[in-house]
Amino acid sequence: MLVGGMGVAGAQAAPHVFFRVQLGSSVAGPVSGRLLVFLKQGKGDKEVNIQEFHPGETWVAAQEVHDLMPGAAVEMDADTVAYPKPFSALPAGEYEVQAVLDTAHTYNYSGRGPEDLVSGVVSLGQWNPGGAEATLTLDQHAEANPMRAQMLDKARAEAKPGELEKVEMESSLLTRFSGNAASIKAWVVLPPGYEKDASAHYPTVYFTHGFGANLDYDLVQGEMIRGRMVTGTMPPMIWVMLDESCAEGTHEFADSVNNGPWGKALTTEFIPMLEKKYRMDARATGRFLNGHSSGGWATLQMEVNYPEVFGGTWSTSPDPSDFHNFTGPDLYAPHANVYHRPDGTDYPIMRMDGKVVATLEQFTKIEAVLGPYGGQITSFDWVFSPRSKSGAPMQMFDHVTGEVNPTVVAYWHDHYDLAHLVEKEWPEKAALLKGRIHLFVGTADTFYLDGSAHLFDARLAKLGADAHFTYIPGRSHFDLYGVGNDRSGLFDQIAAEMYAVARPGVSWKK
């Protein structure tokens, strides 16, 4: 070919790989969404999907589709937006492929669900990229995860008024911010015997989930917590299972220029409403926080920013609380890059059994293909970043190169680096925060979150904050709560410690 019109001969580029994706004739249309095509080596699988613990095994390409009618088709160019490379870079081999239409733009947050349209898995046999064009027909809905569906069905069947109650309140603050009706949602878990003594009031725990979860997850967790109170392994308290999911990921109940005043709405609107409706201890020493992962960071920031409201947080495996270690990279280092260390080696983002299974660069670039909404990296920007001139959050780093934007990091530092905020505000908040921060994390945390926790711990120790940090040997992000054969045993310890603060010297065990 000719390069730049200068008559210089160049190597011929490989032809792009295309797939023909059509909407089944029996599917109601028109439909829109993000069209994803997944491809991997092999044959005979029921599903082809991204495996987060094996990020190089499956290739994925994407494009937006608008108003596709039944029987109509689109030509998917699998080279334009693809991971890990354009599909034309694939070697010849035996492959299988599947198409998914992410109709709700939620793939980055919760994966494929019943609202999404999928094709069957098509075996390409011995396939040469750029050769025969496969046709994929979107003619069925994705199946719900059977284990999750079973747990949710069981929880719904067992949720009874007076035991677990769904509460939703439209927030005037959030509605005014967004211009659309916006609500705070939760499941309220009432302790056994709540209905028998109209004079009894209870300590209250505000729980929030991690990234990828939602109100359905809260129901399942709430049912588990009530069961532990019924059997007597947890003290009688009211638990409010807050939903922090949103279209952009998780809002963390943080006050943000992008997501809105979620913290203010929770503390000035939702909690006062709940305390009128239920017999809760309406005082700081009777309000506690518990959350895991992104929910762990959310509960840390709520305690730091609203210590007059909450009497303590028990946060587990929280997202980074000191940005000198943001799952590894020091965001404040000169010429910081979140993909590569100064020596050029990759920053990992996930480990399993002591081995790196994914790098931060892989994690970010997969998310970018799946869609510019709802992913973990994008979610951080929606919570922490200033707004750009376009109205979207500014990216903390360049998603192609990994180079950090110092201007954005300075904003993150001033508003959301919790270690910095506690140090800055310690003279005013010491009396309220001392002894109230409890943090649990595994020494083998899957996302390296123990690193940031150690830095936060050290800075609180210098302040004399009487913080309580527990590093559980060998535990990862996903088995932290296990005690012996009990996968949720840590809840018992946390709840007992909270109850001792709310009811000093009072025994709750029968």
Question: How would you describe each model-predicted region?
Answer:
Residues 2-10:
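C-terminal segment of classical bacterial N-terminal signal peptides
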Residues 10-12, 158:
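Short linear motifs in intrinsically disordered
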Residues 12-13, 510:
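Compositionally biased, proline/threonine/alanine/serine-rich low-complexity intrinsically disordered stretches
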Residues 40-510:
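Non-catalytic cap/lid and distal C-terminal segments of serine-dependent acyl enzymes
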